[in-house]
């Protein structure tokens, strides 16, 4: 006989009801009676119809998949309670397969429901193994989402201690507003449920239905991401036709929610340990990052660092500039002094020593002299017409127009030049009874 003492106290306090099913060779009557009394002590129903029953499902018929949904007792129990745990005691020689979701109606109500299936050969062995259930919170949890008949072996679902939960995809969308009480290490998506209807490209003509379907599918992806623990996996099963198109859309939405592609080695190890009997091919596997979106990372460094733009200097770091020049070495001086043009045949274009101004003054004086003595004559014959008709080097530039053959008289007076202490002539020209004064402009 199985004793209720193997149930940890904290396990019963967190469990609203326990459903025990097993082979006919196991006597569960006493355990069920103890479970009834303990459950009533832990949770007193407010009304009679809220009483949480714990039924004794003894016999091979309860090991058949088709017997669960048609059994009247199971339907009554399912309509009055919200189980958080379903424990199945299975002898080692039995083979139990929960295909379809016979327990779907019972497990779909709370998002934290779990299905535990243990193999035991004797009651004593069971008592020894069930002591490990006190560490239920640390056991890996796997959630399977499917709306159609799918072969999922609950008895052989894991080689290690794994809590396997099978839920309908629409259930997590209905409970999306509630905060998840349990986070899963892995979520296997076999089907997207009703949210996949009208979500493909064939329904884009109906804008209202298409938008509603895409919104439902986005809510489904958000609910899946909330149920996955940090570092957990999301397995997206492959398909064909419309299902494949929907799963590709789900993959894109899951990536939008923050999932990243998982490495093949990590996926193979997780599937081999916790989902060895999954026949569906995996189209894509995502992993939830361990970091949260929008969270600033703490930088490791000196907290007493100076703000940007502030340099921490020390007096010993200053260098005397005079020590950088060796007086014994000869350096090529940069720039030119006032006597630098003396060695050149012509003054520099940007001369600052005054040589250029002196040469220009001497050149003007030479032109005046040649003009007065008649050494220079017009080569073009247009000098008398004015500056508009004179050449660039015409000595008459700056003078008014005059008649051909008219004599032009120049009176020279000495004036001090503006730079270098040199003298420059200022000529006063009388022409047609008009006095013109040249103040050093080019002629």
Curated annotation (Swiss-Prot):
Cystine pairs: none
Q: Where can the motif Cx2C motif 1 be found?
A: 380-383
Question: Which intervals of the chain are annotated as region Fe-S binding site B?
Answer: 380-394
Q: Per its database record, what is this protein's job?
A: Component of the cytosolic iron-sulfur (Fe-S) protein assembly (CIA) machinery. Required for the maturation of extramitochondrial Fe-S proteins. Part of an electron transfer chain functioning in an early step of cytosolic Fe-S biogenesis, facilitating the de novo assembly of a [4Fe-4S] cluster on the cytosolic Fe-S scaffold complex. Electrons are transferred from NADPH via a FAD- and FMN-containing diflavin oxidoreductase.
Region Fe-S binding site A: what ranges? 341-353
The signal peptide stretch is none
Q: Specify the protein name.
A: Anamorsin homolog
- One short Pfam name that applies is CIAPIN1
Tell me what organism the protein belongs to: Toxoplasma gondii (strain ATCC 50861 / VEG)
Which parts of this chain are annotated as the region N-terminal SAM-like domain? Answer: 136-301
Stretches for region Linker? 302-331
The prosthetic group or cofactor this protein requires is: [2Fe-2S] cluster; [4Fe-4S] cluster
Alphabetical list of HAMAP family matching this protein: Anamorsin
Q: Assign the protein's first listed, main location to one coarse class.
A: cytoplasm
**Compartments it resides in:** Cytoplasm; Mitochondrion intermembrane space
Gene Ontology MF terms in the entry = 2 iron, 2 sulfur cluster binding; 4 iron, 4 sulfur cluster binding; electron transfer activity; metal ion binding
Q: Which family does it belong to?
A: Belongs to the anamorsin family.
| Keywords (A to Z) from UniProt | 2Fe-2S, 4Fe-4S, Cytoplasm, Iron, Iron-sulfur, Metal-binding, Mitochondrion
Please list the residues that bind [2Fe-2S] cluster: 341, 348, 351, 353
